[in-house]
Amino acid sequence: KPGLRYEQTIQRVKYIVGPGENFHTNFSDLVPSVSLGMKIGKTQNIRAGYNMRIWRPGIWNLNPYFDDQNPMFISQGNPDLKSEKSHAFDVAYSSFSAKFNVNVSLRHSFNNNGIERISRLITAEDGEDFGGGHIAPHGALYSTYDNIGKNRNTGLSLYLNWNASPKTRIYVNGRGSYTDMKSEAQGLHNYGWNGSFYGGIQHTLPLKLRLSLNGGGSTPYISLQGKGSGYQYYGLSLNRSFLKEDRLSVNLYCNNIFEKYRSYNNHTEGANFVSKSSSKWPSRSFGVSVSYRIGELKASVKKAARSISNDDVKGGGGGGNAGGGGGQ
């Protein structure tokens, strides 16, 4: 089954108050895809396919604002960035039954114009002039973005859902991949393994109480000039529905209850520098949520198969030492 679609995104950014440089972008992309499927039993099938995935630069990547709040760690976006085009080939196996749902997928993707964050040390004794009265002093670390990455990624993912009993459900979602990244223009090369895991248990207790326990984590991610932080999390929730047709739901939850703060570390290397940063953010949370459902969805009303999702924006960015320019 072949497919082809056209996508266009137009952005116009204008500063009304405060310093900043107005900019606009226009992204136009043709996105092809091909998929093949074959059933090998009543509940099993194999699928193979190719698709192009478009990653458009986010506002932090594009914003040319010269962020020198910390004069020794300066960041600036690049409004001339192009869409990152990633080509992916995958083979997947799935099996479904009343007890088990399994999906295993092998995927290889590559791109030759990856949007990468590039950092370099200002070595000129008098600093470096970036125009508009913006000068980075000697010894400062200057970071921006460019379409310079050549990325190769091969990964294996697994999803398993087990209905252990009429009242108990156990699910696991895991992924492992190997990434090779390089920029010949900058003379940079990095590679490594990355993995993530997510799982949980849901159990229905007496009095229509639903207990959920979930957790997961990831190993450090690989970037062109270093690596970032891994993470782990866990949570517990207790849910109960009330009133006719269970319209009112009350949920008690707690997350990372034994961890008040979490540290995030970043390691970046260049030809003449090594930069390490660490930050702490609140991790523990707990609370109560209440929701009430108004109206009724009739069985004859078909729900929309898809909804608009803005999931094609390149991740990363932020203020200060973490990302591109952020207007003030």
Regions found by a protein language model. Give the residues of each.
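C-terminal beta-signal and adjacent terminal beta-strands/loops
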Residues: 242-328
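Repeated loop/turn-to-beta-strand initiation elements of outer-membrane beta-barrel proteins
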Residues: 43-46, 99-102, 166-170, 207-213, ...
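Transmembrane beta-strands of outer-membrane beta-barrel pores
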Residues: 6-12, 50-56, 65, 95-97, ...
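Surface-exposed extracellular loop regions of Gram-negative outer-membrane beta-barrel proteins
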Residues: 1-20, 27-33, 37, 42-87, 108-138, 162, 255-271, ...
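Outer membrane beta-barrel strand-and-loop segments of large Gram-negative receptors
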Residues: 76-78, 82, 97, 101-173, ...
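Residues on the lipid-exposed face of transmembrane beta-strands in outer-membrane beta-barrel proteins
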Residues: 6, 34-38, 91-95, 106, ...
